[in-house]
Amino acid sequence: MTRVIEWIVSLLIVIALFVVIGLFLPATRTVSHSVETNRPMSTVNDLVGSFTRFRDWNGLVSRDPRIQLTTSGPERGVGAKLEFQSTQGSIGRGSWTLVEGVPGEKIVYELDNRARGDDKRMTFRFERTGQRNQNVKITQRYTVDYGWNI
């Protein structure tokens, strides 16, 4: 009988340890990547601010060339929406919705997919760089809120 009690106590300690570790894990995650281009700011803004050439720049398409993309709402600007569906389990289905756009400064998309977390956002920030500010530095930042990690 004492062996059973020891086993139950050990199991409770392991469960408590997992809960404590889960409480101390970060509640949010941010991933950022920057690239610099010599394209004009207006071209960069048009390319990232609409879904007409989404296949040319988004990584989802390179992971699954047969992905199905469907747009709705306005062609560009706030409210434009792209829904995707893939047969690959790692991609699945979801959507990108443009929620904020400041020309020449930033574009913010709200993401909805099967991945863990809430309030998923993809923010593109534009900054003029180089001699005479002819280049554009594009910083893509993905943020997600995991809440309680238990």
Regions found by a protein language model. Give the residues of each.
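Hydrophobic pocket/interface hotspot
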Residues: 43-54, 82, 98, 109, ...
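Hydrophobic ligand-binding cavity/cleft-lining segments
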Residues: 6-75
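Amphipathic repeat-derived elements
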Residues: 2-23, 92-109
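Tryptophan-centered motif/residue detector
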Residues: 57-60, 84, 140
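Extended interaction regions within the primary functional domain
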Residues: 50-54, 60-61, 72-73, 104-105, ...
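Beta-strand/loop substructures that line and gate deep hydrophobic ligand-binding cavities in soluble
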Residues: 2, 28, 110-150
